[in-house]
Amino acid sequence: MTILAVTWIGGGGANGAEAGVKADGLQEDIGTAVYAVHRFWSDHWSDYFPGRYSPPRVLGSYDGRSPYRPACSGYKVLPYNASYCTSQHFIAWDINLMRMSYTYGDGLVYQVISHEWSHSIQNRMPPRYLVPQIELQADCMGGAALAGASRDGTLTWEQGDNREIAATLRGLSGDTPWTNPRDHGSATQRINAFNTGVRYGVRACLA
């Protein structure tokens, strides 16, 4: 089942038995997530922050096993990770992380992209809104963006989405850099932060 879908894309999904169908579903979900999160912040930046919205450059998927993967400030991005590069204002993710998370369902694909997009928002919003736990704030803002996109009609949020994301975070906790509790917080902390954003919106995530 496609857990989240942009309304103009419609169904399609990740329930196909063939690997090719699953790959198509993953790429569709990635594209959907990018569109929905960008659309939310484009429409609502001025509701929360002064100035103009500046979306990150989307480098998209890379293969973390490749020596030719992207670099940020001279350092190669990590395998099984997703990143926002502050100095170059881009986001990118290891396709292998997305494939790993997809075994649990497609929910975490949306969280990964909304989380990294939130880091780009943190980099451009006034510093007074930052909190010390920037990773948990990004989880909160990511949840707010996805829920906001659902309220706007850009995204369809189905029953059980939050539970699916929670199960994926617990299942992958400590297995990848993106789910490393030392850097990002425990699975429980991340789930609580994400759900705060979903329930109460962007303002609940800000200092």
Task: Specify the residue positions occupied by each region the protein language model found.
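Extracytoplasmic/secreted envelope proteins and their assembly/folding machinery
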Residues: 27, 31-38, 42, 94, ...
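Catalytic zinc-binding patch centered on the HExxH motif and its immediate surroundings
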Residues: 61-92
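Active-site-proximal beta-strand/loop segments in catalytic clefts of secreted hydrolases
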Residues: 61-64, 94-97, 113-117, 122-126
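Polar-ligand-bearing catalytic/cofactor-coordination segments
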Residues: 86-95, 100, 140
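Short pre-active-site segment immediately N-terminal to the catalytic Zn-binding motif
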Residues: 95-111, 126-132
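Catalytic Zn2+-binding segment of zinc metalloproteases
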Residues: 117-133, 144-151
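Long, well-structured alpha-helical subdomains associated
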Residues: 150-207
